[in-house]
Amino acid sequence: MTSLLVAQEVGYHRDGQDILRGVTFAAAAGELVGLIGPNGAGKSTLLKVISGLWPGATGTIRLLDRPLSAYSPRDAARVVAQVPQITALDFPFTVRQVVMMGRNPHLGRFELESERDRGIAERAMRRTQTLDLADRLIGTLSGGERQRVLIARALTQEPRLLLLDEPTANLDLQHQIGIMALIGDLIRGEGLGAVAAVHDLELAARFCDRVVLLARGAVLAEGAPADVLTPDHLRAAYGVRAQAYPDPLTGHLRLSVLDGA
């Protein structure tokens, strides 16, 4: 698989603290890499650093084998699209208008959207099952619908890599599974790569091809979910005694927390 993203020895210092320390991992086309770890481990910070939103990191970040520093913000937005955590989104824009914002990196300052741009946005809405919501105001949608719209906006950028910050936060179980399944389908169907901060370990184990376990800003373990979610790693990262095991009905990894460390 072709590496879309390579991060080597990435560090980030902010407000007197080392938030990231020597983080190394890669993401390839056709795979979903999950960033897991306790609150404060550095997952969201790592996504912001990779995207270029938070400059000043040490180490090396390469996108499509070019240093991140070689990209202008506009050029980077043509390669990497971000899907933030769901916000209120109560501004008076329709779904179609929000999705069309994904074309901004491809347009000049005073350039209007073309028929091709509108076609790209419509295809993204169709892929995310939001086309029937196109004329609704974004603030009237449910959490799951809003998340699909944000993914459609990201697809409209025509990126190579998606960065998703807890895409299932504040969603019920049905929508959590639906969003993660959608991300997986898009990655394989569109040939994209994706890096997602995932809070729920069972969701990460079920849908991610690989996971990167962060603890105190450093990589504690990286690899297939079954290889990373070991009792020793879980104790070191989360401070609990826990055991991952395959569900006898589905084969998906489940997690049992036995007690505190």
Regions found by a protein language model. Name each.
Residues 36-38:
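The feature captures the beta-strand-to-loop junction immediately N-terminal to the Walker
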Residues 51:
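Helix-to-loop junction immediately C-terminal to a conserved catalytic motif
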Residues 59-67, 76:
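Conserved ABC transporter NBD signature motif
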Residues 137-141, 145:
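Conserved ABC ATPase signature
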Residues 158:
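Conserved catalytic motifs of ABC-family nucleotide-binding domains
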Residues 162-166:
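Catalytic Walker B motif of ABC-type/P-loop ATPase nucleotide-binding domains
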